Amino acid sequence: MNAGQPTLAAYLILGAMLFSIGVVGVFLNRKNVIILLMAIELLLLAVNINLVAFSRYLGNLDGQVFVFFILTVAAAEAAIGLAILVAYFRNRHSINVDDIDELRG
């Protein structure tokens, strides 16, 4: 690595911090589904940062290619989740997790 370039440890620390924020967001937020989806996306982003960091460190492009597949699946998951949420909001006029839990029957 050149002088002034971030090291592998810096990327792994960034990934760990983002993953921790995502976990806290999932466990502390039990009310709003949109924030819950954003926290899950943050978890996926942290995993992607770690994959790219290890891929670059090892000199192998497989991790970077795998990240593109993960981002594609994450985008599809977010689009489907938001579409379901919009349909639910139009019917129930609420996006609270507690209200969605009442759908069990």
Curated annotation (Swiss-Prot):
Gene3D superfamilies: 1.10.287.3510. NCBIfam families: PRK05715.1-2, PRK05715.1-3, PRK05715.1-5. It catalyses: a quinone + NADH + 5 H(+)(in) = a quinol + NAD(+) + 4 H(+)(out). One of its GO terms (biological process) is ATP synthesis coupled electron transport. NDH-1 is composed of 14 different subunits. Subunits NuoA, H, J, K, L, M, N constitute the membrane sector of the complex. Its EC number is 7.1.1.-. It is an enzyme of class 7 (translocase). NDH-1 shuttles electrons from NADH, via FMN and iron-sulfur (Fe-S) centers, to quinones in the respiratory chain. The immediate electron acceptor for the enzyme in this species is believed to be ubiquinone. Couples the redox reaction to proton translocation (for every two electrons transferred, four hydrogen ions are translocated across the cytoplasmic membrane), and thus conserves the redox energy in a proton gradient. The gene is nuoK. It comes from Acidithiobacillus ferrooxidans (strain ATCC 23270 / DSM 14882 / CIP 104768 / NCIMB 8455). Keywords: Cell inner membrane, Cell membrane, Membrane, NAD, Quinone, Translocase, Transmembrane, Transmembrane helix, Transport, Ubiquinone. It comes from the Bacteria. InterPro entries: NADH_UbQ_OxRdtase_chain4L/K (IPR001133), NUOK/Mnh_C1-like (IPR039428). GO terms for molecular function: NADH:ubiquinone reductase (non-electrogenic) activity; quinone binding. Belongs to the complex I subunit 4L family. This is NADH-quinone oxidoreductase subunit K. One of its GO terms (cellular component) is plasma membrane. It holds the Pfam family Oxidored_q2.
